[in-house]
Amino acid sequence: MGSEMCIRDSSYVTQALAAVLQLGVTMDYSIFLWHSYEENQERFPDDKKRAMAHAISNTLTSVIGSSITTVAGFVALCFMSFTLGLDLGVTMAKGVIFGVICCVTVLPSMILVFDKAIDKTRHKAIIPDLGVISGWVVKHYKAFIVTFIIVLIPALWGYTHYEVYYDLAGTLPGNLDSVIANDKLDETFAMNSTHIILCDSSLEPKEVNEMMSKIDDVDGVKATLGLDSLVGPTVPREMIPSDIKEVVMDENYQMLMISSEYKVASDEVNDQCDKIEKIMKKYDKNAMLIGEAPCTKDLITITNHDFNVVSTVSIGAIFLIIACVFKSISLPIILVAVIEFAIFINMGIPAFTGTKLPFIAGIVIGTIQLGATVDYAILMTTRYQKERSRGKDKMEAISIAHKTSMPSI
């Protein structure tokens, strides 16, 4: 976070999330190293430095592969049109890189320096021996494949049908002054959303009144307000005092206000904005519809595009990285498919519980979950390949890999 001062300003969302995310994501690498060190201490009980050297060597492949995939997941956020993605993506990618560097340099040094203190404060393992579970999972692997296929269908349905909301004002605490004021305005004047049209100031009053009359007929429009509707079309603009005219008009634009009875981010107000835009474009091709509702409508379009881009980039990048690390085409397909399956379940549950998620959740959660949890798949796969290279058959190799990886995972 300190490096942000030297590069650029960061958003309050990034400041709130980055430290927690970095701790949760990069802590894995420390745990991987520690468990490998404990395992090598049994091989070299009288030489802690040698045990640590072997621990670093054994975990380096999985840590580097895991960290690169995590970085790729965060870098994928940078492809968002929504600039929060760039801000969060760059900050977290840097954080993972710094975390890995500290894990393979500072952490081994600190473990060796404080080794005696660590031994004195050691307590009984809280996590029980998972050998029985590992054996049971490996023995019933066919049942898990069948379960995967059965659960995949509802998980995929839920993943494509969960609801999102774009009106973040609803998530704000009810005791904020701004929220209280908006609630009172809504109760007193039934104000839901207000649109503003910026059109050419050279438009004739007759054209403006004709345009506003058509907009009045659009469903959900409560009232329209402009300079000509206030003073009437019979009053020449030259006779209107300049201090009044300057409030709603300048040399280039004039402002028209539209009061809507629909709520922001609703399907009704989005359809209303489309109809208003069609009407105003007939009179001024360069006219702009602005306000909270039109802005939110644009946000919906942008985030839908961002979701597809970020998902494609993150899956593609992580696939290529795993393929390069393991020098295999089949392994990245299996690993990415397993993690995507977990993402389908995670993001699909709200569809069955009726829970609405904020619009940013689908983009950020999917990308972070893919980049962060693929670490565990890489750790287990690395150990599996190691055991296979030692001459073990596939069942024995996966059993050892599963048993030794479970405590770290």
Which stretches of residues belong to each language-model region?
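Structured non-transmembrane domains adjacent to transmembrane bundles in polytopic membrane proteins
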Residues: 165-331, 337-356
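Membrane-embedded transmembrane helical bundles of large multi-pass transporters/channels
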Residues: 1-4, 8-166, 281-409
